[in-house]
């Protein structure tokens, strides 16, 4: 789980995206919380990001789906964390309409620090090319109304993109976007 503060902004904020990227680089360079292997950490110069762009900051319509049943989310390993679909986001990007599902980790939601945290995994047409093949994640807070800001500039790779010892949630097929999201972290290395 990404440890930098999640955002709850309603307008594009270049500084917020820059802070997120800087925090990722600081975390990954450090010994304590880095998902990198020791060899990669010793040679780490910083993550490769797409250029920050206001184009990839969208205000989505939020619809709560409160009748969803908890389920075990598939991961890259044997672990099966229990999630619940929390809601749906609909938005327009480059003149096309899209929908993404938001999820809540049941165990994490019981902890004070994460009681209002939601998980937004997605894949797109850059996945496997310029970005990690398994998709990327954005951490968000439960919205207070019927809209939510999505800043794709703050998208990050799952830990398993850097180190195979991690077990990461696999992006559900419903969250595969038929568009290039040229924002956030690029793939680490081949």
Predicted regions and their residues:
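Bacterial Sec-dependent N-terminal signal peptides
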Residues: 1-12
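Start-of-domain marker
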Residues: 10-58, 63-67
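Extended, aromatic/histidine-rich regions of cofactor-dependent oxidoreductases associated
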Residues: 14, 156-190
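Short acidic/polar mixed-charge low-complexity motifs
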Residues: 54, 94-98, 146
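A mature extracytoplasmic/lumenal domain signature
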Residues: 62, 102-104, 124-126, 152-156, ...
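Mid-length scaffold segments of soluble, non-membrane domains
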Residues: 66-133
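Acidic, glycine-rich flexible loop segments
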Residues: 119-156
